[in-house]
Swiss-Prot record:
Start-end of Low complexity biased regions: 44-58
An example molecular function term from Gene Ontology annotations: structural constituent of ribosome
Protein name in UniProt: Large ribosomal subunit protein bL32c
Organism in which the protein naturally occurs: Cyanidioschyzon merolae (strain NIES-3377 / 10D)
Coiled coil segments of this chain: none
SS bonds (residue pairs): none
């Protein structure tokens, strides 16, 4: 005879969800930091690089 399974308590469900959200937020912060670093790096590199059309002929 089939027996229904017990329900997971709400506190356990919420605890797992909050843990998952914490991990997701941490990954989001890491990604944003990395994107900011790369953007800043691109900003620093652009003025120093000369385009072929900007070079002065000798």
């Amino acid at each position: 005879m089939a027996v229904p399974k017990k329900r997971t308590p709400k506190s356990k469900t919420r605890s797992r969800k909050s843990q998952w959200m914490r991990k997701a937020l941490k990954q989001l912060q890491k990604a944003r930091t990395l994107a900011g670093r790369l953007a800043a790096r691109q900003d620093q590199m652009q003025p120093t690089q000369m385009q072929p059309t900007q070079m002065q002929p000798n």
